[in-house]
């Protein structure tokens, strides 16, 4: 695993934990927009974990998830990504996988590119969620990569 990819995954976990800390301190845990978008994020993370592990991605409809369930799923997802990443060497990172939700033409990407996609997809929607928190009167956190570096690469803390 490259050091940059490891850093992206570590930042990804920290930034998500910071988002949940901000959301958890707010009075808007029940906001349907936040719950729906955060549910989408973790569903995509779980789908990529399945694909990267050689399993089929789940496609069933789920009810709007609750805050506590979402936080638990995110934490589990990040633990799984960290475990997966520890076992990846150069050949594993270069292996091609097929992203099934883009069927025609087939979307083939390397494991490395899939991991970057997970981080960037989450970053995009996490930014939307932070903006939503602010619009609802909560206090979002600045989770820029540079801030994570400046703070000496802290680990994500999932406890409230």
Question: Which sequence ranges carry the predicted segments?
Answer:
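Active-site rim elements
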Residues: 2-6, 67
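Helix-adjacent hinge/juxtasegments
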Residues: 56-100
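Short, contiguous alpha-helical
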Residues: 6-62, 102-160
């Amino acid at each position: 695993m490259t050091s940059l990819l490891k850093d992206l995954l570590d930042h990804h976990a920290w930034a998500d934990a910071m988002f949940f800390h901000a959301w958890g301190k707010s009075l808007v845990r029940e906001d349907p927009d936040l719950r729906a978008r955060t549910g989408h994020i973790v569903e995509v993370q779980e789908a990529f974990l399945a694909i990267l592990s050689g399993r089929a991605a789940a496609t069933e409809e789920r009810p709007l998830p609750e805050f506590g369930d979402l936080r638990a799923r995110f934490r589990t997802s990040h633990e799984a990504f960290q475990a997966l990443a520890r076992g990846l060497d150069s050949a594993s990172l270069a292996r091609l996988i097929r992203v099934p939700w883009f069927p025609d033409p087939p979307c083939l990407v390397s494991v490395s590119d899939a991991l970057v996609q997970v981080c960037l997809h989450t970053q995009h929607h996490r930014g939307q969620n932070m903006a939503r928190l602010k619009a609802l009167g909560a206090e979002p956190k600045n989770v820029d990569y540079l801030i994570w570096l400046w703070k000496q690469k802290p680990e994500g803390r999932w406890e409230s």
